[in-house]
Amino acid sequence: MKKLAIIIPAYKPRFLQETLDSIAKQNSHEFTVYIGDDASPYPLKTIVDHYKNKFDIIYHRFEQNMGKKDLPGHWERCILLSEEELICLFSDDDLMPFD
């Protein structure tokens, strides 16, 4: 098992591809990315599927939207998807600096 989980709570696709592109460009891929879809009406899974062969990525769609009323609750349920020792909580519009 990898030690680092990159947790990305997601709702809008606007910047998600750029976020995942920045992660894919890293020299080391010793991490697993978890995408927690907050019951988005947008096709986030289509974006995520593009990265399946680039690094370890796990997509989970939640049926209930929590972001509007309990954003920290949505973050927590996304974190609970992972089992890694370390976590890094990203937003779906964050960029990872190149290593």
Across the structure, where does each feature detected by a protein language model lie?
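Short beta-strand/turn micro-motifs composed of small residues
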Residues: 8-10, 37
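Short beta-strand-to-loop acidic/aromatic patch adjacent to the donor-nucleotide binding site
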Residues: 84-95
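Acidic donor-binding segment of Leloir-type glycosyltransferases
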Residues: 24-61
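Short, well-formed alpha-helical segments that are part of the catalytic scaffolds
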Residues: 12-25
